[in-house]
């Protein structure tokens, strides 16, 4: 170009002016109006080579004499491998609000069809990092847990209420869920994991209203001899107020959770919403559907099973079985055989041999034993000692929690499904260099995993593109970054292999790579939160911030060597390499050259200037003009390129090398500066190593930086996960206070008293004994967020039974019972519903708490039921389930024993106060006899 006196712009103009189609207007020939079209669009690459280029000085040349015209792709800035083999990756991102599972199914079908019809045999398409897999498994686990919980709840109800009544009550679950499903679409709710868990949590609570109504109907119908219609009306009316109040108190704790702020609140908002809808639906079912079922089907005695009825039932069961076999729908036949078998088993063995003896012998014995316990507890001053004993237990449990309590975390940590090894080389490192380092990391990871590891599904390596956090996908190319992703098989297929151990093995194997930042991490199982360790240093002067940052790093990692810190990584990039072109403005002005001219000339030489687009069929390809590769990698060679411009004085074209007016200075600069609240901020972040507690590690860091002397106007603050945890703890504490206030208002309205609601609400405080003792004894990790939600939810569940018990005791007193007898009889009559509602809630949560999984679809299709303990959902939701199980188990004892004792204490205190006022009035009357006249 320089020798012949041409510039890149000359070539660009020439190619652009030739590759055009121009409409010349309409022309009339032989009476026909035709559009005059000048067609000059290139049809092959040779035409580009033969374009004539005219220079500013009148010189002429072909493009082929000035440049090499080649068909090529963009410069490779990213690399990808799957299990060591080169691959091309295609990331498919789901639109917001669309069904993930449906999208995954459609993609899988399209890929399978394309594989068969379009691809050669030696080319395969593999779907990796399929997020729908985890979603399917979690949903299946939770749905199976719902079924197991429903079965357990129905079984326990059968013993207390009989099979028919248990089925009436059990129907409350699907009916309430159905009503909730009708409402959810109007709220734009999707069926996600949180929604599924909300339904699981509601299983045991849903049946509470139905248990109280049906049990009361059954008692009046069978024991009092009242006809079924009258018994149904009386039973529903008798418990209407306490049931409605109980439902409202159960709902009360969930209302504050609707206003949970931030991303965590957006994640959990489905939980209180679905529970409020479902529990409201359960109230409708209990008072509209269940009474109808009771009137139609409830009998004092089992119906006589005559031959005709038995033949009819057997005929239906046999027909369904044959239908299932003929149509190939095995599950229809299996369900038909199961239902027929259960019907016969119940008629001839379960009810007469198991349930009837339990109801006639064991349950009355249990009731008499309970009456004896109550009679003993409220004799003399024993009630005071019972309550005092519970208070001492509470104080002792809190002390034990402080001294020997379990670990506390923000969110529970589950066994990882993915392990990520993030590789970061110095800013400016070429993609090929980063790829060579990534290969070393990949080889070491493969060595640790071993060949054909049954726990590992795939190993994927990315360099440049797709090397960032999968939770925050960034499609920009970062040549200095790489990532190795290890995908593990589903939890049920790991056979006890703890995948978390691989993270430690990877860290140990990759410590010795010099000049490279290696971070080993796993996927986030909950809502998005900040880094486990996140230290923000804020101030005005950047150099001072850097100095403080370096002191903090040395203090924590070298001096104190605080355990658990993986690697403190700064978000401030200080060594971003830069080649700065400095223009001599005096020389440039003398030559008539502007800064823009120099800048655009360099940019076009490096990145290329698009002259035109070349069309091949339906595809368009940009025609880029830029200098050869060897020159693009040499800054001095680039500066020797000529600048072609017209001299204003003479009007002649001139060429001046850029080096005549500019020079290159090699330096480093900051990659970017963050600001927060108008102050510059530098952040140090790190993961916490396996086996270390995040809160304990952060406490050590907090104490360490508190003693660090820093200049005035500068601040060191722990943010990230710690800040989120503090905000969550404060919100849940506030939500608990609001919930208790709502519960108090509801109960004061019902009882028209303050003393009795406070009496019942003490069970909320005492139920913490069960929660804390459970976590201490079994050394379970306490989650601030998940356990906190459980404790808030527990508040409403606990007071429900207390309301039913106290309300019925008041009813008996109004009927003329003395207080002591009313307490004993009220407790005995309400013993069944109290135990049943507690047992239903506990058993409904047990499958999730222990992680019991049975694949019922596989079971009814006579395939492997895949029975196993543990799952990803258990690790996350388990603390919530256990907090309710522990708390409610202890609260049931409180309701049955301690609440009657406190009721008796309240009565004796009120009685003494009345006697005291009466004696005072009598004394005043004796001393002042004229006062009555």
What are these regions (language model features)?
Residues 203, 207-217, 240-259, 266-358, ...:
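Transmembrane alpha-helices and their membrane-interface boundaries in multi-pass membrane transporters
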Residues 155, 166-187, 267-284, 312-324, ...:
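Small-residue-enriched core segments of transmembrane alpha-helices in multipass membrane transport
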Residues 185, 189, 258-265, 347-355, ...:
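Transmembrane helices with small-residue packing motifs
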Residues 239, 304-409, 535, 828, ...:
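Signature of alpha-helical transmembrane segments and their immediate interfacial
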Residues 1, 65-67, 79-155, 194, ...:
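Juxtamembrane "pre-transmembrane" interface segments
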Residues 9-23, 42-75, 98, 102-125, ...:
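Surface-exposed amphipathic alpha-helical segments in non-transmembrane regions
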Residues 128, 135, 139, 214, ...:
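Helix-loop junctions and hydrophobic alpha-helical segments within the transmembrane domains
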């Amino acid at each position: 170009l320089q020798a012949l006196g041409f510039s890149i712009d000359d070539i660009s103009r020439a190619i652009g002016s030739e590759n055009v189609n121009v409409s010349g207007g309409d022309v009339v020939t032989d009476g026909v109006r035709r559009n005059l079209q000048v067609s000059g669009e290139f049809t092959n690459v040779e035409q580009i080579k033969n374009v004539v280029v005219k220079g500013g000085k009148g010189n002429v040349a072909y493009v082929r004499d000035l440049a090499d015209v080649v068909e090529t792709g963009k410069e490779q800035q990213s690399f990808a491998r799957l299990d060591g083999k080169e691959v091309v990756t295609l990331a498919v991102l789901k639109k917001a609000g669309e069904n993930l599972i449906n999208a995954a199914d459609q993609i899988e079908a399209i890929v399978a069809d394309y594989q068969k019809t379009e691809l050669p045999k030696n080319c395969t398409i593999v779907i990796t990092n399929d997020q729908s897999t985890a979603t399917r498994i979690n949903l299946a686990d939770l749905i199976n847990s719902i079924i197991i919980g429903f079965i357990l709840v129905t079984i326990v109800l059968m013993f207390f209420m009989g099979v028919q009544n248990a089925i009436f009550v059990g129907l409350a679950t699907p009916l309430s869920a159905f009503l909730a499903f009708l409402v959810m679409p109007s709220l734009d709710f999707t069926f996600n994991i949180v929604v599924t868990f909300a339904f699981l949590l509601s299983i045991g609570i849903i049946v509470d209203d139905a248990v109280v109504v049906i049990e009361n109907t059954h008692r009046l119908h069978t024991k009092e001899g009242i006809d079924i219609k009258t018994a149904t009306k009386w039973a529903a009316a008798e418990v209407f107020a306490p049931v409605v109040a109980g439902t409202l108190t159960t709902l009360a704790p969930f209302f504050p959770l609707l206003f949970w702020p931030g991303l965590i609140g957006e994640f959990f908002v489905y939980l209180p919403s679905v529970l409020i809808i479902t529990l409201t639906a359960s109230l409708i079912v209990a008072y509209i559907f269940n009474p109808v079922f009771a009137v139609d089907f409830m009998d004092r005695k089992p119906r006589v099973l005559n031959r005709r009825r038995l033949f009819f039932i057997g005929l239906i069961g046999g027909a369904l079985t044959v239908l299932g076999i003929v149509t190939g729908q095995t599950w229809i036949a299996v369900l038909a055989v199961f239902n027929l078998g259960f019907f016969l088993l119940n008629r001839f063995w379960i009810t007469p041999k198991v349930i009837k003896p339990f109801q006639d012998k064991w349950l009355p014995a249990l009731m008499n034993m309970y009456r004896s316990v109550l009679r003993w507890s409220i004799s003399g001053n024993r009630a005071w000692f019972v309550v005092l004993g519970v208070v001492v237990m509470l104080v002792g449990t809190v002390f034990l929690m402080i001294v020997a309590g379990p670990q506390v975390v923000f969110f529970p940590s589950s066994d990882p499904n993915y392990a990520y090894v993030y590789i970061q080389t110095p800013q400016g490192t070429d993609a090929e260099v980063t790829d060579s380092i990534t290969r070393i990391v990949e080889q070491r990871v493969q060595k640790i995993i071993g060949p054909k590891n049954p726990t590992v599904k795939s190993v994927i390596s990315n360099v440049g593109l797709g090397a960032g956090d999968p939770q925050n996908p960034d499609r920009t190319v970062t040549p200095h970054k790489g990532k190795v992703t290890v995908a593990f098989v589903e939890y049920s297929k790991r056979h006890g292999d703890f995948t978390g151990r691989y993270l430690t093995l990877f860290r140990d194997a990759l410590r010795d790579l010099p000049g490279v930042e290696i971070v080993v991490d796993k996927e986030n199982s909950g809502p998005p939160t900040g880094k486990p360790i996140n230290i923000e240093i804020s101030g005005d002067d950047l150099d001072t911030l850097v100095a403080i940052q370096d002191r903090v790093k040395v203090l924590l990692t070298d001096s104190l060597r605080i355990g658990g810190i993986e690697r403190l990584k700064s978000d401030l990039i200080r060594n971003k390499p830069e080649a700065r072109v400095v223009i001599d403005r005096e020389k440039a002005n003398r030559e008539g050259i502007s800064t823009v001219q120099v800048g655009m000339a360099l940019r076009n030489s490096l990145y290329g200037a698009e002259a035109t687009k070349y069309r091949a069929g339906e595809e368009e390809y940009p025609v880029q003009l830029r200098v050869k590769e060897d020159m693009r990698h040499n800054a001095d060679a680039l500066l020797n390129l000529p600048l072609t411009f017209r001299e204003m004085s003479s009007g002649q074209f001139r060429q001046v090398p850029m080096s005549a007016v500019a020079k290159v200075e090699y330096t480093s600069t900051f990659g970017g500066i963050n600001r927060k609240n108008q102050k510059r901020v530098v952040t140090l972040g790190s993961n916490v190593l396996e086996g270390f507690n995040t809160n304990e590690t952060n406490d050590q860091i907090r104490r360490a930086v508190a003693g660090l002397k820093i200049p005035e106007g500068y601040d060191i603050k722990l943010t990230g996960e710690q800040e989120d945890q503090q905000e969550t703890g404060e919100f849940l504490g506030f939500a608990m206070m609001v919930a208790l206030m709502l519960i108090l208002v509801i109960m004061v309205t019902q009882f028209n008293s303050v003393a009795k609601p406070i009496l019942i609400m003490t069970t909320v405080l005492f139920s913490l004994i069960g929660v804390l003792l459970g976590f201490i004894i079994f050394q379970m990790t306490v989650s601030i967020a998940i356990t906190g939600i459980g404790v808030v939810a527990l508040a409403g569940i606990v007071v429900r039974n207390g309301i039913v018990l106290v309300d019925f005791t008041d009813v008996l007193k109004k009927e003329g019972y003395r207080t002591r007898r009313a307490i004993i009889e009220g407790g005995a009559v309400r013993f069944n519903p109290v135990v049943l509602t507690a047992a239903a809630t506990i058993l409904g949560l047990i499958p999730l708490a222990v992680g019991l999984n049975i694949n019922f679809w596989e079971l009814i299709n006579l395939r492997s039921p895949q029975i196993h303990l543990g799952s990803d959902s258990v690790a996350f939701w388990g603390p919530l389930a256990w907090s309710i199980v522990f708390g409610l188990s202890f609260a049931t004892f409180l309701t049955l024993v301690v609440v009657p004792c406190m009721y008796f204490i309240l009565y004796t205190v009120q009685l003494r106060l009345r006697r005291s006022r009466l004696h005072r009035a009598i004394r005043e009357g004796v001393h002042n006899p004229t006062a009555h006249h």
